[in-house]
């Protein structure tokens, strides 16, 4: 008989038991659903006020929680109390209870308060455990800072983190936003799984540093905290569970088939060590899941055979949650799902701890051999600097020297003074030379003194090119060898001589006179515009060539003599010169030839450097013969006696001297007859009128020369002034002509006016101006010396219109041009006032002036 079929639930349990090891997710225990409260109970709760989160209640709860956390850590009690005090002080100073949210119900407000309380407790514990871990890891024997300094730094950092994660306004805003999101997800069906955090719960609680730890406790937060992580960690338990998984049978069917047509060819040179390095580098690159390998098995020896290909990498390798918590590993995945019963394997916790201890001891041995322990009690930082292995050789030498000195001092043979060496005899330095006829000679330097050098030195000399003592080379060969140096020295001498004639003060503009005198030559005759109205004449570059041909020389000399020197002679008729035009052209064509030119080049020097640098022979300058002038000898007045000389004060008249002369009995006048005094007075008045002397100066001269002592000097003064009067009148006449000419020719606006004048009009103006200036310069040279001599002899200058004429000569030309320009401006202003329509035009022209 056939057995009855088994019920379907038994088969499902059997298949589940077989496929459970193949699942990638651990089993989930279903939590019992909380019983729903009746709506009446919620209405009753709304009538009660919300429980307040006071500072005292929070501090008491946090203190109780932290007192039992991290007990396994090897930390002094003072350090634990210090960290707990920092957290409690931050809560006491900065905690503010948030108000009730109007948008939430009474029940939701209570949940929010519980959520906030849970967040504060959880965050305080996380911060406390993290800084306990940092205190343990940083307080090492080889640390640079002391334990107290390390604790102070960690306390300051903990206070900052407490401000960020406990009492900051961002904490409550983040909690409220997350709480409202959970409420919306709870109302919507199937959205609870979407709020699951990106990383699994408890990931950030674990330490990413590979085990074994020296802290003494397992669950320690040593990575950087995050506000979002702490907010997600404070969610209710139902939101922290993993999402529902698929049915194992459906999960098994969804696995795709493997493609084994293209197997992976593993190279034989890749060992297990290479795989471990690659896996460790991949794990370091993941910031959210820092893991480390847990397999402690010894590496297998290298096998040259090809390794088998794997369908997928093992996801169980690396640092896992079970390794952190010290739990036994999960059962290994079987090769076939047909496993009727699971084998129980012994726990490997003890083996892992033993291997950790072995590796710790091994590391301590390696560190001890690499860095020897310090014998002195110096701080670690100073010990590292002074006990570096590179300074070991120097320390050994110093210790050896110290031992020798101690031995000598103990034996009594130690002498504070070093042993004196015997004086050396002076020896000259000799050099051995071998001459051409194989004669060896020792040449010694001249010994200046008997001093000896304790430090000897040696200089290797280069071999000699030739020996002049043996006569290996004749003077001609030596001169040929030194021809390059000779040419260079000659060139330097030439340039030195040339540059000595170049002025080095050509850029010093302040050394010359402010006003350059006019040229003595008439440069207008040498301009190209001077030949516009004349026939074209051959230009002579080198006048020495003229002497080769008499006919051409005579012709050119006659032309140069006929050349006018003044612009008035340039307008003369040129019909007389046209008669010799035919003879000039014939001589010009027939006399010049190439042979004559080359003959001239061979007979004369072609170096023009002396012309460029002005090194030609100095020519005697042609002096312009000045017009005959009278001798400058002035009759000196009779000297004054000390008792006769009165004290003259300008503007004051000593009438005693006049009465003394007129009322004195039996006294004769100083000048003889009275008519001479009258004639002298008449001459003086004429001089005053011509020179336009002001009344004040006339009165001063009258007072000065009315005394009997000065009256004898008056005739000499009048004669001297009469001699200076004529040149002054001539100069004033020339200056008046120049003023009239500049009134017409110095207007700057004449260049912008349209006139019918030719282009040579401005050249003629320049010629007239230079002619007048030249005459003034010739006259001023003699007049200045005459006026200076008069002022030197008589002690007072010649006055013209109230000014000393010497001072007037220095600036009257510039003043003349200035007042001419001012007169033009006045005329423009007057014309602008008379014609208001053209006032704008005259304003622009006046501004340009």
UniProtKB/Swiss-Prot annotation:
Keywords (A to Z) from UniProt: Coiled coil, Differentiation, Fertilization, Spermatogenesis
Similarity remark: Belongs to the CCDC87 family.
Free-text function comment from the UniProt entry: Plays a role in spermatogenesis, where it is important for normal sperm head morphology. Also required for the acrosome reaction and thus normal male fertility.
Entry's Gene Ontology BP terms: cell differentiation; positive regulation of acrosome reaction; positive regulation of fertilization; single fertilization; spermatogenesis
InterPro entries assigned to the protein according to its UniProt record, in alphabetical order: CCDC87
Protein biosynthesis found in the keyword field: no
Species of the source: Homo sapiens (Human)
Annotated protein name in UniProt: Coiled-coil domain-containing protein 87
Coiled-coil parts of chain: 387-415
């Amino acid at each position: 008989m056939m057995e009855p079929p088994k019920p379907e639930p038994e088969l499902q349990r059997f298949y589940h038991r077989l496929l459970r090891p193949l699942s990638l997710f651990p089993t989930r225990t279903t939590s019992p659903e909380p019983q729903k409260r009746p709506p009446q109970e919620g209405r009753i709760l709304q009538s009660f006020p919300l429980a307040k989160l006071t500072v005292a209640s929070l501090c008491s709860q946090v203190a109780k929680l932290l007192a039992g956390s991290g007990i396994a850590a090897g930390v002094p009690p003072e350090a634990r109390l210090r960290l707990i005090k920092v957290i409690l002080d931050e809560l006491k100073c900065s905690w503010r209870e948030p108000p009730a949210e109007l948008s939430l119900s009474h029940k939701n407000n209570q949940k929010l308060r519980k959520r906030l309380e849970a967040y504060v407790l959880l965050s305080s514990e996380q911060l406390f455990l993290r800084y306990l871990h940092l205190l343990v890891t940083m307080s090492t024997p080889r640390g640079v800072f002391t334990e107290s300094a390390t604790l102070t730094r960690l306390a300051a950092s903990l206070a900052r983190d407490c401000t960020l994660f406990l009492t900051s306004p961002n904490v409550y805003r983040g909690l409220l936003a997350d709480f409202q999101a959970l409420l919306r997800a709870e109302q919507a069906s199937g959205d609870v799984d979407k709020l699951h955090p990106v990383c699994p719960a408890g990931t950030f609680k674990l330490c990413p540093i590979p085990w074994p730890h020296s802290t003494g406790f397992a669950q320690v937060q040593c990575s950087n905290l995050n506000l979002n992580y702490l907010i997600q960690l404070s969610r209710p338990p139902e939101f922290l569970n993993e999402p529902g998984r698929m049915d194992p049978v459906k999960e098994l069917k969804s696995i795709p088939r493997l493609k084994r047509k293209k197997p992976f060819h593993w190279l034989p040179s890749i060992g297990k060590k290479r795989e471990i390095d690659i896996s460790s580098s991949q794990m370091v690159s993941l910031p959210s899941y820092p893991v480390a390998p847990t397999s402690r098995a010894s590496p297998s020896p290298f096998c040259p055979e090809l390794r088998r290909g794997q369908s997928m990498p093992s996801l169980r390798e690396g640092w896992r949650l079970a390794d952190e918590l010290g739990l036994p590993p999960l059962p290994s995945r079987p090769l076939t799902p047909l496993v009727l019963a699971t084998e129980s394997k012994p726990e490997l916790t003890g083996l892992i701890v033993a291997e950790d201890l072995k590796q710790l001891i091994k590391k301590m041995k390696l560190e001890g051999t690499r860095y020897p322990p310090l014998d002195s009690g110096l701080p670690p930082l100073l010990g590292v600097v002074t006990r570096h292995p590179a300074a070991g050789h120097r320390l050994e030498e110093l210790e050896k020297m110290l031992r020798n000195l101690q031995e000598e001092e103990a034996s009594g043979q130690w002498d504070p003074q070093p042993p004196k060496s015997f004086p050396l005899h002076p020896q000259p330095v000799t050099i051995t030379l071998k001459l051409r006829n194989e004669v060896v000679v020792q040449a010694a330097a001249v010994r200046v003194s008997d001093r000896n050098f304790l430090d000897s030195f040696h200089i290797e000399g280069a071999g000699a090119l030739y020996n002049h003592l043996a006569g290996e080379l004749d003077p001609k060969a030596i001169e040929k060898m030194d021809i390059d140096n000779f040419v260079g020295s000659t060139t330097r001498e030439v340039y030195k001589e040339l540059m000595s004639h170049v002025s080095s003060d050509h850029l010093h503009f302040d050394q010359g006179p402010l006003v350059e005198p006019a040229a003595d030559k008439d440069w207008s005759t040498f301009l190209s515009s001077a030949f516009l109205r004349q026939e074209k004449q051959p230009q002579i570059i080198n006048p020495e060539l003229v002497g080769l041909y008499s006919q051409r020389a005579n012709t050119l000399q006659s032309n140069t003599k006929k050349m006018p020197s003044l612009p008035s002679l340039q307008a003369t008729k040129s019909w007389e010169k046209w008669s010799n035009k035919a003879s000039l052209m014939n001589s010009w064509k027939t006399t010049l030839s190439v042979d004559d030119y080359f003959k001239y080049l061979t007979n004369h020097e072609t170096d023009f450097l002396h012309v460029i640098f002005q090194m030609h022979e100095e020519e005697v300058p042609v002096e312009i013969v000045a017009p005959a002038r009278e001798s400058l000898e002035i009759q000196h007045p009779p000297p004054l006696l000390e008792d006769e000389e009165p004290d003259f004060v300008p503007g004051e008249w000593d009438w005693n001297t006049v009465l003394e002369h007129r009322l004195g009995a039996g006294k004769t006048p100083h000048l003889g007859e009275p008519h001479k005094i009258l004639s002298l007075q008449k001459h003086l008045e004429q001089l005053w009128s011509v020179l336009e002397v002001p009344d004040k100066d006339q009165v001063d001269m009258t007072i000065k020369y009315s005394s009997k002592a000065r009256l004898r000097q008056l005739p000499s003064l009048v004669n001297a002034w009469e001699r200076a009067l004529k040149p002054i009148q001539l100069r004033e006449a020339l200056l008046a002509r120049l003023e009239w000419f500049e009134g017409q020719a110095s207007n700057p606006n004449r260049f912008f006016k349209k006139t019918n004048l030719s282009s040579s009009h401005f050249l003629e103006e320049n010629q007239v101006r230079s002619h007048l200036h030249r005459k003034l310069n010739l006259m001023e040279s003699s007049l200045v010396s005459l006026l200076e001599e008069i002022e030197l002899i008589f002690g007072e200058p010649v006055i013209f219109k109230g000014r000393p004429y010497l001072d007037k000569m220095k600036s009257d030309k510039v003043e003349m041009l200035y007042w001419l320009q001012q007169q033009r401006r006045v005329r423009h202003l007057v014309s602008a006032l008379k014609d208001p329509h053209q006032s704008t035009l005259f304003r622009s022209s006046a501004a340009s002036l």
